[in-house]
């Protein structure tokens, strides 16, 4: 197969835009500059004064053309966004934020981890539905509304000093329909007390949606994905600078140059080296999105990049007034030796204070005079790193001592370890539940012999990946056919003893009998199977723990995903009506995300978007990686289960994986 693009290099739309200073800034040239993500910088220092003048000319002209007022940024409830240096996108069920054993949120763990490694967060996006949505007819609002204690979680995060974004998925049109999206989102924002809305896949919100959200939460901060149109900087206080490629000599972010109070968050979600994003953020006085778990995949930041964030935000927070209101000189003149070493700086000036935010594009540490002249300060800049130099006149503002202290502290906080912090997913041994020795005979099933096996597993390449590792590494923008295409993997293992897999799924009537006779009560009853419905239909609205408990009551256990597949090839293996996905004993965790493998496919589910979990009956060799939600949200009308029994005594119940 020949790909139409190289995923390891930026696409044309990701690249910085050159600035033509050889002709007057007419309407055509000004409109062209409106479309930039980053204004590319000239390599020749002699060309930079004209380049800076052109940036000023464009900003003045563009603001005139768009009749810019900037009222959004003056709103008391929106001002915080201008100082939001770090935002983290966090899956609600990230194991830093949620304890699966206790079934409770643990915001204190998330906050402490971020403080130690990143210098603390300013905001979080509570990601909720994707990539689980589509497994059944629940819509994106259900995946917030059904969460017990979500309002308490938001309040806890607020008490910890963090702002909270909720996520809006405009592509969710194939699940159950309720009220229109604007009504649902506005109500959610009001009920949770959310500070902002992250606009998934949207560069900007419709004006009507903005108005509805403003009614629910005056001053609401909207953050779109990717490039924000100049005209909408007026009512979007932040934007997501995703996959913004910089020029070799660092350039200027167009949206932030247009409005210094507009916060942008750099992010290249699949990259393992974030130094270029961090340097661009540092030189432009903006922030970054710290995103270490991308839809269930670990993409953790290196110790070097984490330390860079700590150093950066310590100074940015101390210098916020200077960075927003001071005079900004991009690519300020430096000593020739610094320029030759690939060292560049922005200069920020206000109230007799001068701050140089410095970056080193080279791979090796550089030490030398920053400026021309004998009185120049000497600076050390780590390879691929940042530094800061500041000086003040005798009459300095009251924030100057805090800034000087922050710079001194940052100088002692660095780490040169740029290795990727791998985090393998491990299979979780199921809890040892008491089995009923008097349970009736398992009944009809498919008997699997002991011994080795090899399987081919088919799956769709989603952003969730499969068992280990990220599906994309250092890729700019995964697109079809790299995204959502059909793939295979091979699994090898050993059955240590004979296993019988039930011929059919457990029925709703059988599960009700279990609940009545055993007195079983789940730790969290949210969405737990009710007493109504066809007793001969497959049991649904059962979580993994519920299914395990039932099978133990029957003297068995859940089959592993491999046992399920081996049995499903036998003519005696049957599917119930309607078909539902089957839980398997395949729970894994990398310490941040829990997932299982579903088998079988379902007659239920959502259609209309590739972002949904696939629906429809699937072949025996097909698998879906499902991220585990907590607090009962794993209970689905489209997921049932069947049991398995070990036919030989004193045999470990699970196969070895290789």
Q: At which residue positions do the language-model features occur?
A:
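Mature N-terminal, pre-catalytic/accessory segment of carbohydrate-active enzymes
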Residues: 1-122, 379-382, 393-439, 649, ...
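Active-site-proximal substrate-binding groove within the catalytic cores of carbohydrate-active enzymes
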Residues: 43-48, 52, 217-219, 223-369
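Structural recognition of the beta-strand scaffold that forms the well-ordered cores
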Residues: 88-92, 122-126, 164-166, 196-199, ...
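Aromatic-lined carbohydrate-binding/catalytic grooves of carbohydrate-active enzymes
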Residues: 110-206, 519-533
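Active-site neighborhood of glycoside hydrolase catalytic domains
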Residues: 149, 156-159, 172-240, 244-249, ...
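Extended beta-strand/loop cores of jelly-roll/beta-sandwich
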Residues: 396-563, 568-569, 621-658
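Short, well-ordered junction/capping motifs at the entry into regular secondary structure
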Residues: 562-577, 589-597
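Alpha-helix capping/hinge segments and adjacent helical runs
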Residues: 586, 591-624, 633
């Amino acid at each position: 197969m020949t790909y139409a693009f190289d995923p390891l290099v930026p696409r044309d739309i990701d690249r910085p835009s050159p600035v033509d200073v050889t002709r007057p800034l007419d309407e055509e040239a000004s409109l062209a500059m409106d479309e930039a993500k980053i204004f590319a910088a000239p390599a020749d220092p002699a060309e930079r004064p004209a380049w800076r003048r052109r940036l000023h000319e464009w900003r003045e002209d563009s603001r005139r053309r768009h009749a810019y007022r900037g009222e959004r940024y003056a709103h008391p409830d929106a001002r915080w966004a201008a100082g939001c240096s770090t935002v983290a996108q966090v899956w609600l069920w990230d194991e830093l934020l949620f304890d699966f054993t206790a079934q409770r949120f643990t915001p204190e763990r998330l906050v402490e981890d971020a403080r130690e490694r990143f210098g603390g967060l300013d905001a979080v996006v509570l990601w909720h539905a994707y990539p689980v949505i589509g497994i059944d007819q629940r819509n994106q609002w259900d995946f917030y509304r059904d969460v017990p204690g979500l309002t308490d979680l938001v309040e806890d995060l607020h008490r910890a000093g963090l702002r909270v974004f909720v996520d809006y998925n405009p592509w969710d049109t194939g699940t159950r329909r309720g009220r229109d999206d604007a009504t649902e989102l506005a109500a959610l924002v009001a009920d949770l007390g959310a500070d902002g809305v992250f606009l998934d896949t949207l560069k900007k919100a419709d004006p009507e949606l903005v108005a509805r959200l403003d009614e629910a939460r005056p001053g609401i901060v909207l953050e779109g994905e990717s490039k924000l149109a100049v005209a909408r900087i007026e009512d979007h206080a932040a934007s997501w600078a995703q996959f913004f490629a910089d020029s070799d000599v660092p350039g200027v972010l167009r949206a932030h140059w247009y409005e210094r109070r507009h916060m942008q968050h750099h992010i290249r979600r699949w990259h393992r080296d974030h130094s270029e994003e961090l340097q661009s953020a540092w030189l432009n006085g903006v922030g970054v999105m710290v995103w270490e778990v991308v839809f269930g995949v670990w993409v953790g930041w290196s110790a070097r990049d984490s330390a860079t964030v700590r150093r950066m935000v310590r100074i940015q927070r101390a210098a916020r007034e200077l960075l927003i209101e001071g005079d900004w000189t991009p690519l300020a003149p430096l000593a020739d030796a610094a320029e030759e070493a690939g060292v560049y700086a922005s200069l920020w000036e206000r109230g007799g204070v001068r701050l140089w935010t410095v970056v080193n594009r080279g791979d090796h540490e550089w030490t030398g005079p920053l400026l021309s002249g004998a009185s120049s300060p000497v600076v050390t800049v780590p390879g691929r790193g940042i530094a800061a130099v500041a000086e003040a006149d005798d009459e300095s503002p009251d924030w100057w001592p805090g800034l000087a202290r922050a710079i001194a502290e940052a100088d002692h906080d660095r780490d040169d370890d740029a290795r990727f912090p791998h985090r393998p997913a491990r299979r979780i041994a199921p809890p040892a539940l008491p089995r009923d020795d008097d349970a009736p005979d398992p009944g009809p099933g498919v008997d699997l012999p002991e011994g080795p096996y090899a399987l081919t597993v088919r799956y769709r390449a989603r952003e969730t990946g499969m068992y280990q590792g990220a599906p994309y590494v250092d890729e700019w923008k995964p697109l079809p056919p790299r995204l959502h295409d059909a793939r295979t993997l091979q699994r090898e293992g050993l059955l240590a003893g004979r296993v019988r897999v039930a011929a059919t799924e457990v029925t709703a009537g059988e599960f009700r009998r279990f609940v009545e006779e055993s007195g079983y009560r789940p730790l969290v009853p949210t969405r737990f199977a009710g007493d109504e419905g066809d007793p001969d239909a497959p049991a649904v609205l059962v979580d993994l723990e519920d299914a395990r408990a039932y099978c133990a009551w029957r003297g068995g256990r859940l089959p592993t995903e491999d046992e399920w597949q081996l049995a499903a090839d036998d003519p005696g293996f049957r599917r119930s009506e309607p078909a539902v996905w089957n839980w398997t004993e395949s729970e894994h965790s990398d310490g941040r995300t829990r997932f299982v493998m579903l088998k079988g496919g379902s007659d239920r589910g959502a259609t209309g978007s590739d972002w949904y979990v696939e629906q429809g009956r699937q072949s025996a060799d097909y698998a879906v990686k499902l991220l585990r939600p907590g607090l009962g949200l794993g209970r689905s009308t489209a997921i049932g289960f069947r049991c398995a029994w070990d036919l030989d005594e004193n045999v470990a119940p699970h196969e070895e994986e290789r």
